[in-house]
């Protein structure tokens, strides 16, 4: 046995990687926290960075007296001891932590500072004597915004649920949750010391139900990791799905079961799966769920929409295939056999096959080892008002291998018709199993002809669905009559996928959003739709249609001729906002979306821009009853005005002084860098390339200020410089910061000239790092997709 002692001095980080240091501008306090996944523990202490190298860690921290220090385990009894200061007037003390259970290095954690901390405890309902201390912490200057009672109650409810479902006791001796500033991710599952993104989950003003549900989802996602990922850790990063896909799936399930957000799977369908379909549609980013990962640089890019969202959607299909009871029983068996160790795909398949009585390896080969989505279409034949035949067809091509792929789909086909009140209601639910290239749904023959067929109703499987012509016509003309939240979410997903793939025109989608996305739409779905409508308008529409629909996104309601020649209301984004119920979630969602669209109004010319700026001023002046003007909403309005060159530097500075928080400083940086001036664009671009002192949040703010779609005429000239610099940026910055710069400064709303310049760079830089090339290819694919959509042929409706 050998002992190696290392004494070292390290650098604090401002990138969110390693040991990050933050100075609070409000009270001058300093806070530290770690983030190591996948391989940044080496930035703080010398370790072996492999997930299958697990050991017990013990930590001793010397820190200013009065600080609270948290780690993976409880502090040892009497573990805080005062020490004499060395060369200072203030004293220090040392906090010692008990040795942890076996952990890989990336899960070790430390959070230190004068935190505001609220404590509680949880007692297992099924294991007498198992009581775990709980806490929630945030910066002291934000103490008034910590919803401690709500968060502790949610934590207990989640632990109750997982305790019952997994039949394996909570495997750690404490559960601290720390909300931290300048965080790169949503959260991180360090056992016993979970960290959360302050900007996302510490609410400083009014928020929607969807935001609270999203916070609950993240909390329960990380809690699931205490078992999937922490207790049983993937052997290597190609099995990242064994923790992230599971946590994404289980977090959504628990959001509904423990937190009471019964719309959780609707939100999953409209948000998480949209991310999955986008990542899976790009040749540059699609990969099998179980992907080859050669090194830790590649591992960092494995945390994507395939590993998280597609993997979770496929797990939902797995549960539909084998049943929830078998899934949970297999999970508990895996925990028993691999506790505090590692596991691979084969380990999970073995226990699942054992419990379900089915050999799951063929299922896994079809779903986990192939890339790209299945595409399912339906062919409906009607005779004399009744269904003569209904045929489902699936096709799939793995972009990685080039092979044709057929997957087994356990799904539901929903038949919808208009009722007497004009609502689209489901008249028949047809469960089917599609395993071959086609399937005749014999149960449908003879049923009344539907107005709409929704393949994959209830969202049980993962597939891109192409509706038949009758259904597409129904969706574009009457989607607002579809009142079931899940069916409505799936219908919107179908339409957006059709636009993204240039099957239908951008105008059809934006028109549908303006007409049919009413205030009864589930808030998370409404948020997604309004964001998609703006993106489709700015990126996918040809220049003429872009101006027409951008004007509608920011305009008041107006009247125009209907098909019968009678006046009809033409919906506008401003009109929809003014009509939203005061204080409602819909009002908050529409105000945020309208201000984002308003920031692009330079595309409407001087007169149009001035009118939009005047309306943004109305919001700032409180002209919308019920809309609370918290700091966030004020900054949104001021940033929109800055993008329109309709606000002064003095006004922005006055708001910064009124909101002197870290968030306020970051918002001020974004707003002040958003003005449409050529010299300012050059200054911001140069600062992003050369200023290595910028924190991760401040880089994001400057990138957002620089890369405004409506300012493309001011930023187009920077593309050649961008392409000259990115390889040096990749080599000279940490991967987290470099990724933000490479993606954020890419000419995302460019033209054919930009696309060709990027292709030339790829051709002349074949030896550029694989991870860098992947990011460039990903952004190029999005640009090429947008250019194709612009050529589809817009028809202004």
Task: Show the residue positions of the predicted features.
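Hydrophobic helix-coil surface modules that form long, contiguous segments used
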Residues: 34-39, 46-220, 248-252, 261, ...
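A surface-exposed beta-strand-loop module
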Residues: 1-25, 46, 87-89, 437-449
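Long, ordered, helix-rich scaffold segments
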Residues: 305, 387, 403, 442-797
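Hydrophobic residues positioned within well-ordered beta-strands of beta-sheet architectures
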Residues: 4, 57-59, 95, 134, ...
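Beta-strand-rich binding/interaction modules
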Residues: 360-361, 371-456
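Short edge-strand/loop segments of extracellular domains
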Residues: 21-31, 182-185
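Solvent-exposed residues in well-ordered beta-strands and their adjoining turns
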Residues: 7-11, 62-64, 100, 197, ...
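Hydrophobic alpha-helical and helix-loop surface patches within well-folded domains
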Residues: 1, 97, 135-395, 399-402, ...
């Amino acid at each position: 046995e050998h002992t190696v002692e290392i004494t070292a001095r390290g650098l604090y980080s401002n990138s969110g990687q390693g040991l990050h240091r933050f100075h609070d501008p409000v009270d001058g306090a300093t806070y530290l926290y770690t983030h190591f996944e996948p391989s940044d523990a080496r930035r703080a202490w010398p370790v072996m960075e492999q997930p299958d190298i697990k050991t017990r860690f013990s930590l001793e921290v010397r820190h200013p007296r009065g600080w609270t220090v948290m780690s993976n385990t409880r502090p040892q009894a009497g573990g805080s001891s005062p020490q004499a200061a060395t060369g200072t007037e203030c004293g220090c003390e040392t906090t010692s932590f008990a040795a942890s259970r076996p952990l890989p290095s990336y899960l070790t954690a430390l959070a230190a500072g004068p935190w505001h901390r609220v404590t509680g405890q949880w007692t297992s309902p099924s294991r007498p004597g198992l009581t775990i201390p709980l806490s929630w912490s945030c910066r002291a200057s934000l103490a008034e915004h910590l919803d401690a009672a709500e968060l502790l109650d949610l934590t207990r409810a989640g632990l109750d649920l997982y305790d019952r479902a997994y039949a394996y006791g909570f495997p750690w001796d404490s559960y601290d949750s720390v909300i931290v500033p300048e965080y790169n991710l949503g959260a991180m599952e360090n056992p016993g010391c979970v960290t959360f993104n302050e900007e996302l989950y510490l609410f400083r003003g009014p928020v929607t139900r969807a935001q609270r549900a999203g916070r609950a989802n993240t909390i329960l996602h990380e809690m699931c990791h205490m078992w999937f990922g922490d207790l049983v850790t993937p052997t290597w990063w190609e099995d990242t799905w064994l923790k992230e896909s599971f946590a994404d799936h289980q977090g959504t399930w628990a959001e509904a079961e423990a937190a009471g957000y019964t719309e959780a799977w609707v939100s999953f369908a409209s948000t998480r799966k949209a991310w999955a379909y986008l990542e899976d549609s790009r040749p540059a980013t699609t990969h099998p769920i179980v992907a080859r990962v050669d090194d830790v640089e590649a591992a960092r890019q494995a945390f994507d929409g395939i590993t998280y969202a597609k993997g979770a959607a496929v797990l939902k299909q797995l549960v539909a295939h084998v049943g929830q009871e078998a899934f949970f029983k297999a999970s508990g068996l895996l925990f028993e056999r691999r506790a505090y160790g590692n596991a691979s795909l084969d380990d999970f398949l073995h226990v699942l096959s054992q419990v379900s009585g089915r050999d799951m390896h063929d299922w896994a080969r079809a779903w986990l080892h192939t890339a790209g989505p299945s595409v399912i279409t339906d062919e409906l034949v009607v005779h004399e008002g009744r269904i003569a035949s209904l045929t489902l067809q699936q096709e799939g091509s793995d972009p990685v291998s080039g092979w044709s792929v057929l997957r087994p789909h356990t799904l539901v086909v929903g038949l919808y018709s208009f009722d007497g009140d004009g609502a689209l209601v489901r008249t028949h639910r047809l469960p089917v199993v599609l395993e071959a290239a086609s399937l005749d749904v014999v149960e449908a023959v003879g049923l009344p002809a539907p107005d709409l067929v929704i393949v994959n109703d209830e969202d049980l499987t993962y597939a891109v669905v192409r509706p038949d012509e009758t259904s597409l016509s129904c969706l574009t003309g009457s989607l607002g009559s579809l009142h079931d939240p899940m069916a409505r979410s799936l219908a919107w997903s179908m339409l957006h996928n059709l636009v993204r793939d240039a099957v239908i025109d951008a105008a059809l989608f934006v028109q549908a959003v303006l007409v049919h996305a009413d205030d009864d739409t589930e808030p998370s779905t409404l948020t997604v739709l309004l964001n998609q409508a703006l993106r489709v308008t700015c990126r996918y529409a040809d220049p003429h249609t872009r101006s027409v629909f951008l004007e509608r996104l920011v305009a008041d309601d107006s009247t125009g001729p209907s098909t019968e020649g009678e006046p009809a209301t033409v919906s506008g984004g401003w009109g929809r906002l003014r009509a939203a119920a005061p204080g409602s979630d819909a009002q908050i969602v529409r105000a945020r979306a309208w201000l984002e669209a308003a920031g692009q109004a330079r595309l409407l010319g001087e007169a149009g821009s001035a009118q939009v700026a005047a309306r943004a001023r109305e919001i700032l002046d409180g002209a919308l009853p019920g809309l609370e003007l918290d700091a966030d909403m004020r900054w949104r309005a001021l940033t929109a005005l800055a993008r329109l060159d309709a606000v002064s530097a003095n006004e922005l500075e006055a708001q910064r002084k009124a909101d002197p928080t870290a968030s306020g400083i970051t918002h001020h940086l974004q707003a002040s860098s958003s003005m449409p001036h050529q010299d300012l664009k050059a200054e911001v671009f140069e600062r992003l390339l050369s200023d290595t002192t910028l924190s991760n949040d401040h880089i994001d703010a400057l990138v957002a200020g620089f890369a405004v779609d409506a300012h493309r005429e001011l930023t187009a000239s920077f593309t050649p410089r961008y392409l000259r610099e990115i390889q040096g940026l990749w080599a000279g910055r940490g991967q987290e910061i470099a990724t933000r710069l490479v993606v954020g400064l890419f000419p995302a709303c460019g033209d054919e000239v930009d696309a060709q310049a990027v292709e030339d760079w790829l051709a002349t830089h074949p030896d550029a790092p694989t991870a860098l090339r992947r990011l460039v290819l990903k952004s190029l694919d999005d640009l090429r997709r947008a250019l194709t959509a612009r050529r589809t042929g817009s028809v202004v409706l």
